[in-house]
């Protein structure tokens, strides 16, 4: 049975990603910083007959991430956990958000996936197969870049750069690495006014996590179509 690891899997898009991958026959490791919330999510998914286990994972904690290297198999990795650190400030312009807030965003949104990939990619290389999906945002798209929310925008833009770096380094392997803009999704982060349900937001992510051999790598996708960086 293939194994999928999803960070931030206890709610929102992450929870739906776990559900959809489980429905496709994956044994899902649901990463959650909060064990109680993680176990609650696992219980709900197991109630649907899915093979899901809770994995305590704080993507801002290097020691927590280091334990991932002990895993025996990971076929699909979805770097989904993220924070919108700018929301701690009333004025979210780049001239007012402190550098410390930007660093907080990078710690979770960029360095978290970076460290996770350092642990998981060797596992994928040993087994000769892997799919990595970095959940990004349209707010990181340089072609459409606007102002405000610098911690979120900059950290997610750097995550896209990580996708390109890894895809290049792994181009002669069967490990595919892509970024995705899930769209504006109704989650705690996206808010209740968002246009997409979590099921819709997860669809392209799951598609990228299950690409066939020879599929695209090093791309930025939305609605299963490649978009400009």
Predicted feature descriptions by range:
Residues 1-29:
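Canonical Rossmann dinucleotide-binding motif of NAD(H)/NADP(H)-dependent dehydrogenases/reductases
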Residues 6-7, 79-80, 131-137, 176-181:
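Structural signature of the Rossmann-like NAD(P)-dependent dehydrogenase/reductase core
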Residues 24-40:
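Conserved glycine-rich Rossmann-like NAD(P)H-binding loop of the short-chain dehydrogenase/reductase
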Residues 35, 55-67, 99:
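The beta1-alpha1 cofactor-binding region of Rossmann-like NAD(H)/NADP(H)-dependent oxidoreductases
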Residues 83-87, 91-106, 114, 118, ...:
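Catalytic loop of short-chain dehydrogenase/reductase
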Residues 87, 143-144, 181-193:
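Short beta-loop-alpha junction of Rossmann-like oxidoreductase domains
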Residues 172-173, 179-182, 191-229:
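C-terminal helical subdomain
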């Amino acid at each position: 049975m293939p194994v999928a690891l999803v960070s931030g899997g206890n709610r929102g898009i992450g929870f739906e990603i776990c559900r959809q991958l489980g429905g496709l026959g994956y044994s899902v490791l649901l990463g959650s910083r909060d064990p109680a919330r993680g176990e609650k999510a696992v219980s709900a998914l197991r109630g649907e007959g899915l093979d899901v286990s809770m994995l305590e994972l704080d993507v801002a904690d290097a020691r927590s991430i280091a334990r991932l290297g002990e895993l025996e198999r990971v076929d699909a990795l979805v770097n989904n956990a993220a924070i919108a650190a700018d929301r701690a400030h009333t004025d979210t312009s780049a001239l007012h958000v402190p550098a410390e807030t930007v660093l907080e965003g990078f710690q979770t949104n960029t360095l978290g996936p970076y460290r996770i990939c350092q642990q998981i990619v060797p596992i994928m290389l040993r087994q000769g197969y892997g799919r990595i999906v970095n959940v990004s945002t349209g707010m990181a798209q340089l072609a459409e870049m606007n102002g405000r929310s610098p911690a979120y925008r900059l950290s997610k833009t750097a995550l896209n750069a990580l996708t390109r770096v890894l895809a290049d380094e792994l181009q002669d392997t069967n490990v595919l690495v892509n970024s995705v803009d899930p769209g504006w999704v109704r989650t705690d982060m996206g808010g209740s006014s968002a246009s997409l349900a979590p099921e819709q937001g997860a669809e392209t992510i799951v598609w990228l996590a299950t690409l066939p051999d020879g599929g695209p790598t090093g791309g930025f996708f939305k609605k299963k179509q490649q978009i400009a960086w």
